[in-house]
Regions:
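Conserved N-terminal beta1-alpha1 strand-loop-helix module at the mouth
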Residues: 1-129, 145-148, 155, 161-162, ...
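A short, flexible beta-alpha/helix-coil linker loop
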Residues: 18, 137-139
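Short, glycine/charged-rich beta-strand-loop motifs at protein surfaces that mediate ligand recognition
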Residues: 140-144
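Short hydrophobic "strand-cap" motifs at the C-terminus of beta-strands
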Residues: 167, 189
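C-terminal binding/interaction regions
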Residues: 181
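Short, glycine/charged-rich "phosphate-handling" switch motifs in NTP-dependent
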Residues: 184
Length: 209
């Protein structure tokens, strides 16, 4: 049985291969997850790690969930999400479809990554439980792409009825404005993990939601 969607976390700490392979990552993740608690989620996002390594790392983070109630969401890898029993999976345009995931994992919460109001509508109609919409501001991972800022979030929120999580270059000082425009919450990667005190950085995001 799926968790009630009103319990969807509002601050999403997104990882990467590079972040998860840093020395002391699990210790830092524990601190971040403790701060966020059930208002937060850690996204386990990997393109390079082999399956056994990703599986072991996900299980380690899931143990931290038991202590902190911070959600664990696996990006793309439905097999890892199912094998570990995480709280959700985040699908991209390269992933299998939302209906396909529902057919094999009916209890799994499903997020969809979108880049337009139209994609958000399609994701909701397909049965996704939320969308991560971006990018809002220019980021090092998407150099040269035009920043969409708050008008983009307005358009996405107006197009759907499920929760919208904004992503892309979002700093703590942006959060309140984005939430006031109807977003359920925000996702951040470098803004949390590249800070010397990731625990404090996460708390800054949470305090603005």
């Amino acid at each position: 049985m799926k968790a009630p969607i009103e319990e969807l976390p509002c601050v999403h700490a997104v990882t990467s291969d590079e972040i998860m392979l840093r020395p002391g990552f699990l210790r830092k993740a524990m601190a971040v997850m403790r701060v966020l608690g059930d208002k937060g989620a850690i996204h386990i996002r990997s393109q390079l790690l082999d399956s056994p390594t990703l599986y072991s790392l996900t299980l380690a983070l899931l143990e931290l969930h038991e202590q902190t109630k911070c959600w664990c969401i696996v990006n793309d890898r439905v097999d890892i999400a199912l094998a570990c029993g995480v709280q959700g999976v985040q699908l991209t345009h390269k992933s299998i479809s939302v209906p396909d995931v529902q057919s094999i994992a009916p209890a799994l919460r499903i997020g969809a990554s979108v880049h337009s109001a139209e994609e958000a509508r399609d994701a909701e109609l397909a049965g996704a439980d939320w969308c991560v919409a971006g990018h809002v501001f220019e980021t090092p991972s998407h150099p040269g792409q035009p920043r969409q800022e708050t008008t983009f979030i307005n358009e996405v929120v107006a197009a759907v009825s499920f929760p919208v999580i904004a992503i892309g270059g979002i700093r703590p000082e942006h959060v309140r404005s984005i939430v006031h425009r109807g977003a359920h919450g925000v996702a951040a990667s470098r803004g949390i993990w590249n800070d010397e005190n990731s625990e404090l950085a996460a708390s800054r995001y949470l305090s603005q939601v």
